[in-house]
Amino acid sequence: MNQSEMCPRFEKAVDILSKRWVALIVFQLLNGSQRFSEIEAALPNLSGRVLSERLKELELEGVVKRDVIPETPVRIEYSLTDKGKALAPILGEISKWATEWIDPSFLD
């Protein structure tokens, strides 16, 4: 694959991951299937409206899968697809980089 073929794909990947909250949502789902309320509780600064939008976007991109479990009441769980799970090493490296290079005194 030459540079001109890779650039649009790379740009799309960065566009997806750089959207606010996306990387943190994916990172959270690396722990396994979760309900909306579990994701929301794990990311307390993320509003329910934005979480809902991001999950829909990630579902459209094929990164997240939404499973409806036919119980009473109906249960909905979100999990990563193979495409989403493939982000694990990337997010792991970002986590290592942050641990080494981000000064805790600059965090909110």
Swiss-Prot record:
- Residues annotated as coiled-coil are none
Could you state a single Gene Ontology molecular function term? DNA-binding transcription repressor activity
Entry keywords, A to Z = DNA-binding, Transcription, Transcription regulation
Q: Which SUPFAM superfamilies match?
A: Winged helix' DNA-binding domain
Q: Name one GO cellular component term.
A: protein-DNA complex
Q: Does the keyword Signal apply?
A: no
Q: Name one GO biological process term.
A: regulation of DNA-templated transcription
The HTH hxlR-type domain covers which part of the protein?
Answer: 7-106
Tell me the superkingdom of the source.
Answer: Bacteria
Short name of any one Pfam family annotated for the protein: HxlR
The protein's name is Uncharacterized HTH-type transcriptional regulator YvaP
Q: Which organism is it from?
A: Bacillus subtilis (strain 168)
